[in-house]
From Swiss-Prot:
The keyword Protease does not apply. Residues 442-460 are annotated as: Nuclear localization signal. Belongs to the nepro family. Keywords: Developmental protein, Disease variant, Dwarfism, Nucleus, Phosphoprotein. The gene is NEPRO. May play a role in cortex development as part of the Notch signaling pathway. Downstream of Notch may repress the expression of proneural genes and inhibit neuronal differentiation thereby maintaining neural progenitors. May also play a role in preimplentation embryo development. It is linked to Anauxetic dysplasia 3: An autosomal recessive skeletal dysplasia characterized by severe short stature, brachydactyly, skin laxity, joint hypermobility and dislocations, short metacarpals, broad middle phalanges, and metaphyseal irregularities. Most patients also exhibit motor and cognitive delays. Residues 437-457 are annotated as: Disordered. Transmembrane segments: none annotated. InterPro entries: Nepro-associated, Nepro_N. This is Nucleolus and neural progenitor protein. The lineage of its organism: Eukaryota, Metazoa, Chordata, Craniata, Vertebrata. It is found in: Nucleus; Nucleus, Nucleolus. It comes from the Eukaryota.
Amino acid sequence: MMAAVPPGLEPWNRVRIPKAGNRSAVTVQNPGAALDLCIAAVIKECHLVILSLKSQTLDAETDVLCAVLYSNHNRMGRHKPHLALKQVEQCLKRLKNMNLEGSIQDLFELFSSNENQPLTTKVCVVPSQPVVELVLMKVLGACKLLLRLLDCCCKTFLLTVKHLGLQEFIILNLVMVGLVSRLWVLYKGVLKRLILLYEPLFGLLQEVARIQPMPYFKDFTFPSDITEFLGQPYFEAFKKKMPIAFAAKGINKLLNKLFLINEQSPRASEETLLGISKKAKQMKINVQNNVDLGQPVKNKRVFKEESSEFDVRAFCNQLKHKATQETSFDFKCSQSRLKTTKYSSQKVIGTPHAKSFVQRFREAESFTQLSEEIQMAVVWCRSKKLKAQAIFLGNKLLKSNRLKHLEAQGTSLPKKLECIKTSICNHLLRGSGIKTSKHHLRQRRSQNKFLRRQRKPQRKLQSTLLREIQQFSQGTRKSATDTSAKWRLSHCTVHRTDLYPNSKQLLNSGVSMPVIQTKEKMIHENLRGIHENETDSWTVMQINKNSTSGTIKETDDIDDIFALMGV
């Protein structure tokens, strides 16, 4: 009936401990006072442990932990605080798989049968020795696991505070610090309850073993003092003071800058009161200046802005290209306009303040200096309400801070430094951030649509020209075949008056007969050559429609022949 224990693996370190196959309760006649005291103490401590394990606060904190890990898995998967928080989650999952709560609940329900018995009977029902040993073994394993959980919480706390000192993911790190602190406090209370449960439960085991011995774990002896069994981690968790990480890393100053403290609250309240008073005065002036003439009067609003040397708002001024234009404009004009808009969006902004920032960035010789300069630029952009530039510089500041710590450890990164400096300078001077904006993408789409609209009429013209050339070539081929056939039929009996209606004029003009006959022979030979060339050109046109030079030349020859014939 003993549980099989693999060599080299302690029974308390097993996730699933098999239950005993024998009966779970033993009836005791005339129980002694020591047994009654042990039963009462075990019932009390079991009830308190079950309440602490079923706490809704523990469930809520566990759900928050799982949600934080799930939502930040992609961007924080390689960060040390995130990995340490994963170890905390693994400890909680293993504690849940142990089914400690179910075992203690079963033990607690075995004692409930004694309440239904009358007081006159001196019979008591107690759990058997295998059941008590199983619960004791799970308590030992849970105490070891909770000590490991507390240690993981401490490591996560310290790593998160260290990461908070880098001024990266501040809100997330604060959430993790608070979450780990609450888990440490709550499970430390659960550990205390389990330690308090072990002592009366060990006394109950001795009484039950004396009444009816049925050992379940024969190769393992339960310790009488659980604190000695837990060893040094127990004393570190309960006796040793926790390190003060916030004061050592200067996190208090950072948090005081981000979140308002009591010393700064009077100043802030005074500033808000001054702002409210100014708004009230402006409202009074506006009420006095109102003119009621029965009709709405449009007041000209003049917005006056403070003059500044460096106006980064010019970055955001993009040329709006109208996609819908008249199709009567030439294609060359549209191309020139597109080129002007393209180059105008990339104009170099040479204001003094931008040049001063760029000069400072270029003079930075380390990531420490570069981070300071970027921080100043971010503060300036936020003061001028330049959100896009502040976000861009903030991302560069995060990268510079990470590389700054690598540089502090002795790593030389000159190429990285030059690359980041170049990208920042290009963004400030040439407005490279505009090229990747959504508005720029929309502008490019509208330009492409406009180009397509301009190109469509040309394609139509090309198709119509090809059709006309084909029709004309077909007509010339038919006319040439008809004339050649007629010429063959009337070759011998044709009269010169049919070919030349003005033959009388030719005869009167003194044209001799041999000359006319030679001309007729030349015309006949030309018609044959034209017919052959026409058929050849037709086959060539079917293969390649774009080659139209031959057909145009042939049609010119046919026109000359018909002009000579008088048709």
